[in-house]
Amino acid sequence: MILFPAIDLKDGLAVRLEQGDMDRATVFNRDPASQAGEFEALGFRYLHLVDLNGAFAGHPVNAAAVDRILETVSIPVQLGGGIRDMKTVDGWLEKGVTRVILGTAAVRDPDFVKAAAKAHPGRVVVGLDARDGNVAVQGWAETSNLPAVDIARRFEDAGVSAIIYTDIARDGLLKGLNMDATIALADAVSIPVIASGGLASLADVEALLEPRAKKLAGAITGRALYDGRLDPGAALALVAGRS
């Protein structure tokens, strides 16, 4: 079980959105690289980055901020947002990103995702962001009629390293993870699943460590860390104690 601290990048700043709404952004740190360094110093061993502007634009926008983060930390970094072609995948991996997250492409161009996973074994993650169980794309601006489980099954045996499942309705609202939907997805595929959207407390971390959640590979947390609702030391110790 890995806890991933999240840094969402908007206009070069570290922010958190509520339910994926770019107009409901709270700035938590004007220096994302400094924030990344703080997370590493706290003991987190993997960083989760999202280029929010890039997710809407369809191409990288916050590249300078990502570059500074890569220069600052030594822990692995996974990055999503605006990665829609092989050139962008190759570019980020060459720069030092450990894993790229492909979301919109997983819905609209699954063959590209499979090709990327084949070209870069263990370095491609599928991001499935769901609203009422159906996958949303283009930075959550559009919701498809495709269930997340159906999309996930497309990538069985494709070589993707993980699936990140985000419940948009809970993201940034500190309402707790949608454990039922996330566990159902994990039980439906053989690919490791990472939970996202709503993690708010140590109780949520405890829930991730329950026997019914044994197939979950990790969880992403953002606002709870920034708000001080989740004690990073206690959360990391809890996970380490159960590993």
UniProtKB/Swiss-Prot annotation:
Catalytic residues, chain numbering: 8 (proton acceptor), 129 (proton donor)
GO biological process terms, semicolon-separated: L-histidine biosynthetic process; L-tryptophan biosynthetic process
UniProt subcellular location: Cytoplasm
Enzyme Commission no: 5.3.1.16
Pathway: Amino-acid biosynthesis; L-histidine biosynthesis; L-histidine from 5-phospho-alpha-D-ribose 1-diphosphate: step 4/9
Keyword Isomerase: yes
Alphabetized InterPro entries for the sequence: Aldolase_TIM, His_biosynth, HisA_bact_arch, Isoase_HisA-like, Isoase_HisA-like_bact, RibuloseP-bd_barrel
Main location: cytoplasm
Listed Pfam families: His_biosynth
S-S bridge residues: none
GO MF terms held by the record: 1-(5-phosphoribosyl)-5-[(5-phosphoribosylamino)methylideneamino]imidazole-4-carboxamide isomerase activity
Keyword Nucleotidyltransferase tagged: no
GO cellular component, one term: cytoplasm
Keywords: Amino-acid biosynthesis, Cytoplasm, Histidine biosynthesis, Isomerase
Catalysed reactions, semicolon-separated: 1-(5-phospho-beta-D-ribosyl)-5-[(5-phospho-beta-D-ribosylamino)methylideneamino]imidazole-4-carboxamide = 5-[(5-phospho-1-deoxy-D-ribulos-1-ylimino)methylamino]-1-(5-phospho-beta-D-ribosyl)imidazole-4-carboxamide
NCBIfam families given in the database record: 1-(5-phosphoribosyl)-5-[(5-phosphoribosylamino)methylideneamino]imidazole-4-carboxamide isomerase
Family of this protein: Belongs to the HisA/HisF family.
Listed HAMAP family: HisA
PANTHER family: 1-(5-PHOSPHORIBOSYL)-5-[(5-PHOSPHORIBOSYLAMINO)METHYLIDENEAMINO] IMIDAZOLE-4-CARBOXAMIDE ISOMERASE
UniProt protein name: 1-(5-phosphoribosyl)-5-[(5-phosphoribosylamino)methylideneamino] imidazole-4-carboxamide isomerase
